[in-house]
Regions:
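N-terminal acidic leader/helix
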Residues: 3-26
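Acidic, low-complexity, intrinsically disordered interaction modules
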Residues: 19-71
């Protein structure tokens, strides 16, 4: 698993490489099974994560929200 900065995760979303699921409310917001391939951590713990679906689509949680605990 690779470590990213929150800025890197946000740039992946801005460039269209990853889909933003920061404010997702349920697991079904990602319509396929996925695995975690990266994370962003700071002094208060996990601040973001990068997920990869079985189709190859990337999903990013770019802020410290409840989506970190859902996924």
């Amino acid at each position: 698993m690779e470590r990213y900065s929150c800025k890197q995760l946000k740039s992946l979303v801005a460039s269209g490489v990853a889909k933003d699921v920061t404010y997702a409310n349920k697991r079904s917001d990602i319509p396929e099974s996925y695995t975690q391939i990266g994370y962003a951590a700071g002094i208060y713990g996990c601040n973001g994560m990068l997920l990869k679906g079985e189709s190859g689509q990337l999903y990013a949680v770019t802020d410290r929200t409840s989506a970190i605990y859902i996924f």
